[in-house]
Amino acid sequence: MIRQEVLHAVLDPKAVHFKQFWLSSVDRDESELLEVLCFGNYGDLNAIQSCEEWKDAIESKLRTLTLLGLCEVPSELEYDQAMASCCIPDDVILEQRMVELQAQVHFQLDSVGRRIKVLRCLGARDIYNGERPLLLLRDAARSRESTLAGLRQWKQKLQYQLR
């Protein structure tokens, strides 16, 4: 049984962090849903077997979370890449989704060039640190190890540029 506060968070368009719910979850269906919301992407939507009555809300949330994840790294994002990752059918819907992320991401849309220039990403997706076993996902794209590896690469790049 999915807790009411979890459902409210899924339905809240501004909510992007679900790890606190995942860590305290004891229900298998709820844990699977929260695992995908925390660490999965739009492509993992079909892994969730329960929650049919909220499928549209969950699908919408995963699109938003996947876009946020794409904005964490690059300074420029092609429309085609974002649309393919989130299964978004047209430019207008993509631009609407980006506007929904304004509190998390500062960006400029280039509708003609079909690019999103990420100026600053204020939010980030949840990070998996092995707190409990994953039930559905083979591995989490954003884990402690991958975050540390990215920081080490960034440090080396900065050190190289300063030489």
Swiss-Prot record:
One of its GO terms (cellular component) is cytoplasm. Its main location: cytoplasm. The keyword Cell membrane does not apply. GO terms for biological process: cellular response to pheromone; conjugation with cellular fusion; protein deneddylation. The keyword Nucleus applies. It is found in: Cytoplasm; Nucleus. Keywords: Cytoplasm, Nucleus, Signalosome. Residues 5-120 form the PCI domain. Component of the COP9 signalosome (CSN) complex that acts as a regulator of the ubiquitin (Ubl) conjugation pathway by mediating the deneddylation of the cullin subunit of SCF-type E3 ubiquitin-protein ligase complexes. The complex is involved in the regulation of the mating pheromone response. Component of a COP9 signalosome-like (CSN) complex. This is COP9 signalosome complex subunit 9. The lineage of its organism: Eukaryota, Fungi, Dikarya, Ascomycota, Saccharomycotina.
